[in-house]
Amino acid sequence: MTEAFSAIHELGGIRGIGGIRGIRRSSYWQQKFLYLFLFQDHFYGIVYNSFVNESEYVRNTTIHGLTYGFNFVMLKHLMKKLHQSQSPSILFDELTNQSQFVREILMIASNPILQPRSRDSAGRINEWNGYQSIHSVFPFIEDRIHNPSNYLDITIPHCVHPEILIRICRKHILDISFLHLLRLMLHTSNHFRIPNSSNRVINLFYRFLWNFCTQSIEYCLIHLWKQIYKFQCTPFWFLFDKTEFIRKIQSVSKKSNPRPDRTISRKNCLIHYVRSQNHLILVIDGEGDFESIKDWKILFIILWSKYLHSWLDPCRISVKNLSNNPLSILGYILYTKNDLIKIRIRFFDFSINTSLVIKGFCGIIPIISLIRSLAKEGFCNTSGRPICKLSWTTLTDNEIIYRFDRIMRNIFYYYSGCCKKKGLYQLQYIFRFSCAKTLACRHKSTIRTVWKRYGSNFARNYVVLEGVKSIPSNLWQRESDEKRFWCLTITQTNFLADLLRKSKNIYSVG
C-alpha cells in the first residue's frame, strides 16, 4: 500500500492531476487507489498542481465544474479534521463549507477519469466540430438540413435517480469504495432531487454528473448511427428510373415480356443532432423521414430504458412537423417556408424560364413570450406597458443608461438572424420608456424632464457618456426586415432566452 501512495505522490508532484491516469495498471490492486488517496495529504499537492500553470505559475480555474477560487488552506484543515472525526456527518451536512469541499474534491478526482474519456471517444470517431459561438447552430441547420419536414423533439429529465449515475460511473471507475462514497452523498442530498435549487455552488457537483450521464447517452447514439448509416451521403439532384433504359434494351434484344425494373436510386439519410441543455433535437434529411423519425423514437425509448434502467415518459419525446409545429431552440422559433426561385435553362438555340421551389428555415422572434419574461424582470407589466425598474433607482444615471444600452444591444444582435424584425421595435419602445421612467423616479421628476435633458430619442441614440458607447441612430433601420445576419461572436445565451426556456408558453408567436 505504501508503494501505491509513493507512486501517487510522485505523480502529483511532477505532473499534477493529469498524471493519475498514467499509473501502470499491471496488477488488480493498483486500479483501486482512488478512494485511498482521496483525503490524504498527498492529494493537497495534486490539487494544487492542477490549479497552477507550471509555465507561468498562475492560478488555473478551468477544471470542469469549478469556476471559482479554491481555498487550499481550508482543504488542508479539512483533511486533518476528517482523519480525527469519527462521524460521517461532516461529509453530508450541506450547510457547511466542509461538504462543499468534499464535493469539489470528488469533482477534481473524477474529472480526469470521466471527462477525458469522452474527449478521446469524440476524437476517435471524429464526430464533433467545435464552435464557440451560439449562433453557429443556426447556419449549421440552414446549410445541412436541405429538405426538412419532421423532427424528433426530446426533453431530457433533469432529475436522474442516483443509482443510474452510479451505474454509469461504475463502467469507468473501478474503485468500489469511491462509488460507495458517491452513492452516500447522492442519496443523502436533497438538492439533487431539486435541480432548480438557488444554491449554485451545490448544483455544480450534480450538474457535472448530469452532463456526464447525458454525454454517455449521446455517444451511444453516435455509435448506433455509425453502425446503421455506414456510407457517406453522395448529394445529387435526380433520381434514376430504369424503365426507359429497359425498353431500349428490349427493342434491341427482342426479348419477350421483360419485367421492367422500377427501382429508384435514393440517397442515404442524414442525421442531424442538436442539443441545448436538456433539449435534444433529431432531424433526418432524406427520403422517408417520417418513418425513420418514428423508428428512432422507439429506438431512443428502448435505449433509455435499457441503458439507464429507467422509464422515459412518452410525453417527453414527440414527432413534430416543422410546418405546423415550429422548432423552438435557444430563444428562437424556427419554421420552414417555401422559397420560389426563378431560373433560366438555356439550350442550344432557345431558353426557357422555370421556377424551383425549395424549403428553407426562417426564424421568428417570440414577442409574447419575451414580453412576459420582461414583465417578470420588472421592465413592463404583463400587457407590455413599460414601468419603472425600481431596483435600479439607486444607481447613477450613467449606470442606468449603460445597463439599458447593453440589454438593447444584446437583444438586437441576438435576434439579428430572424426574418422579420418588426417585433424588435416593440421591445425598443418598452426599454425606452422603462429607462425614462427609471430616471424620472430616481430624480423624482417626470418623463418630460428626462426627455428635455437627454433628448426624446435617447433610447435609440444615447448621448455619449464617459465609458458608455452610444447606439447609432440608424442601428435598428440599418438592415431590412427580411435580411438576416448571424453574429458569430456571441458565446453566451441571452438572458431572455434563458427565461424563455423556463417559460411554459414558449411556442407563442407574436
From Swiss-Prot:
UniProt GO molecular function: RNA binding
Subcellular location: Plastid
Any one of the GO CC terms: chloroplast
GO biological process: mRNA processing; RNA splicing; tRNA processing
Main location: plastid
Keywords: mRNA processing, Plastid, RNA-binding, tRNA processing
Family: Belongs to the intron maturase 2 family. MatK subfamily.
Biological role: Usually encoded in the trnK tRNA gene intron. Probably assists in splicing its own and other chloroplast group II introns.
Protein name (record): Maturase K
